[in-house]
Amino acid sequence: MRHSPHYEQIPFEIPDNWVWVKIDEINKFKSKTVNPQNSPTDQFELYSVPTFETGEPEFPYGKDVASSKVEVEEGDVLLCKINPHLNRVWRVKRRMAQMKLLASSEWIVIRANEIIPEYLVLTMQSPYFRELMMSNVSGVGGSLMRAQPTFVKQYMIPIPPVREQERIIEKVAQFNLYIDTIASTLP
C-alpha cells in the first residue's frame, strides 16, 4: 500500500458529499485598518472582546476609540485570539445601516461567502476546533494565552453542502430551545 500524506491530515471521516478545507482556502478576508479618531464625530459599530458576553457590539464615536480597528462586513465570523479556551466566536450582524462595521485586532476575521456564517460559528465552537485552537497557543498561560493566526489558517474544517449546513443550524437551534426551556423550569 502506498503512503498517502493527504489522509494523515484528515481529522475524521465525513460523508462523501462533504469536504475538508483549510480555513485559508475559504477565507476571502483582506484586512483593512481604520483609525476611528480620523473621523471623531462618526459613530461606529464596534465588535470588541469586552462586549462579546453581551452579544451586542458597542457604538462609540471615533473620538472615543483609542486605537486602529479592522473593517469588517456583515456575515464575517470573528474568532477571538485572546484566551481561546473561552470559545468566543461571533457572527457580524449589522445593527445600524449607516455605521461602518469595525472589529478589534484581537479577532481573527473569517469571510467565507460560500458558507453560511452560522455554520462556521457552530464549527468553530465545536470541541474538535477548540482542541485545535488550544494545541498551538502562545503565552505562558491564563489571560496571556493567544491563538496564532498562522496556525489557525491551516486548520481543517468539514464543510457539508448548503442544505446540510441549513439543517445543522436548524437542529442546533431546536436543541438550544429545548435546553433553554428545561433550564427555565429548574429551581
Give residue ranges: language-model regions.
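Generic, well-ordered alpha-helical scaffold segments in large soluble proteins
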Residues: I26-K30, L78-K81, H85, N113, ...
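Active-site-adjacent structural elements in folded domains
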Residues: K63, V137-G142
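Short coil/turn segments at secondary-structure boundaries
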Residues: H3-P5, P36-F44, S135-V137
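Non-catalytic DNA-recognition/assembly elements of restriction-modification systems
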Residues: H3-T33, I159-K171, F175-P187
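Sequence-specific dsDNA recognition surfaces
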Residues: E8-Q9, D24-N35, Y47-V77
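A short beta-sheet element
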Residues: S68-V70, E74-Q125, F129, V140-G142, ...
